[in-house]
């Protein structure tokens, strides 16, 4: 007869680097059951203090067990050198959690290698990582972003917890150790919320296939945790979870949601239904909503809710595509046909000039400038805020034409002056001849 254990999903949690191993230790201290813990590090000393089921020192050759020195390339190379050992430790897993603190050397560089191996071996691979605090520096933040991008390529689902959001959970006296401990607790709650759904039978049961349907190839995910007591406790805890400061964005439009309720035996179905309906309203209309309940009388009247929302990448890409399609499908606005005045057209006389007197703008130059303004406004109506090349060409031609007109007017004036001078000279000559003739005759 086949043992029922053969049909239980095998879940392994791999902590990579200092932050990942600390998170694993925290989960072990909290008594997380039903999973196998694996610690992977380049720091031999840190591994000595871990209670993980399997400890894998990948820095024996590259770093002599002294750590990666905050260099992700060292962490990546160390993991590559021990691929066979990593494969051996992950073998047989149905689901693998890879936890790490991004920004350092081993976690940033080795976590994508570990996740890639797990994914290649057919395990549902979930990354749960933290982003560094701002006070840890720009270099660490930049390395973290690069590591997160690499993890996203190889994980089915990636949950990123920004440490800076943890500051919103504490008061002004929150210590550094308390902040990092809070980060480990968030990682623990996320992993526990998922594993408990699979490993602990509940009133509303969820199996591994349900979890896979939501988290396989899901891309980025958001995770929120809430707890409450007293009246309306389930709805209150759910509101805390979906409005958690740990979420970098809202869960609106999620196409996949895992919803876990944990409480005592008095946990009511109606209040669970009300909370699940609230989550469904925030999600995509075709959301794949998987929710389950876990009965734990040790919680007393407390209710804990874990929400993991996935499918944002596809939903947002589809929304962006729809917006682009809507823009491209919209008919182009026809340009307004405006009557462009000719150079001989005149504008209506203005009643008052800037000097208080009447003024008529019947000068061709002013009329031509008005026409230019009409043409430029018409061009800009189709070209946005920036001046187009046609505007510049027109103004250049306009200046040339104005210059030619001015030169033509000057020459015309010169010729008129010359003709008047010639007439004066002729009159002088005529008068001179009248005077000179008699004297000559004399």
UniProtKB/Swiss-Prot annotation:
Residues annotated for GTP binding in this entry: 18-22, 105-107, 136, 140, 184
GO cellular component: cell division site; cytoplasm
Official protein name in the record: Cell division protein FtsZ
UniProt-annotated location(s): Cytoplasm
Main localization of the protein described in the UniProt heading: cytoplasm
Biological-process GO terms, alphabetical: division septum assembly; FtsZ-dependent cytokinesis; protein polymerization
Comp. bias regions, Low complexity: 329-341
Region (Disordered): 329-442
Cross-referenced InterPro entries: Cell_div_FtsZ, Cell_div_FtsZ_CS, FtsZ/CetZ, FtsZ_C, Tub_FtsZ_C, Tubulin/FtsZ-like_C, Tubulin/FtsZ_2-layer-sand-dom, Tubulin/FtsZ_GTPase_sf
Pfam families: FtsZ_C (PF12327), Tubulin (PF00091)
Gene: ftsZ
Family assignment from sequence similarity: Belongs to the FtsZ family.
Transmembrane regions listed in the UniProt entry: none
Record's compositionally biased regions (Basic and acidic residues): 349-362, 390-431
The keyword Cell cycle belongs to this UniProt entry's keyword annotation: yes
Function: Essential cell division protein that forms a contractile ring structure (Z ring) at the future cell division site. The regulation of the ring assembly controls the timing and the location of cell division. One of the functions of the FtsZ ring is to recruit other cell division proteins to the septum to produce a new cell wall between the dividing cells. Binds GTP and shows GTPase activity.
Origin superkingdom: Bacteria
Keyword terms, alphabetized: Cell cycle, Cell division, Cytoplasm, GTP-binding, Nucleotide-binding, Septation
Lineage summary: Bacteria, Bacillati, Actinomycetota, Actinomycetes, Mycobacteriales
